Amino acid sequence: MDKNFIIDQNMINYIFSHTNNLHKVQKKLLKYNEKLGHIKKLQISILQANFIQFIIKINNYKSYLEIGTFTGYSILSAALALPKNCKLIGIDKNL
C-alpha cells in the first residue's frame, strides 16, 4: 500500500484471508507488466488489488468504476470480486 497508509501485518493477513488467490490471468498480467521497465510502477501492488477485492466483497458492491486502467490488473482484480450481473466500467486514455 502507499507509504502514508498505515497498515499492520494483522490487517494484511486479514485482507489476504478474505480474498482470492491470484487468478491465472492476474499472474499472466503481472508477468507481462514486469517486462515494461520503469513504467510498471503504474500498476497497483498485489496487496492493493486484494484490498480492492476486500472492500468490494464486504460492502457487497454491484458496480465498479475505474479511471486509468494501465494494463488492466486492478480492474481485473475488481471484476473477480464482483458478483455476476454487475456493472464494471474502465476508462483510460487511448495512446
Where are these regions (language model features)?
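A short alpha-helical cap/connector motif
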Residues: 1-95
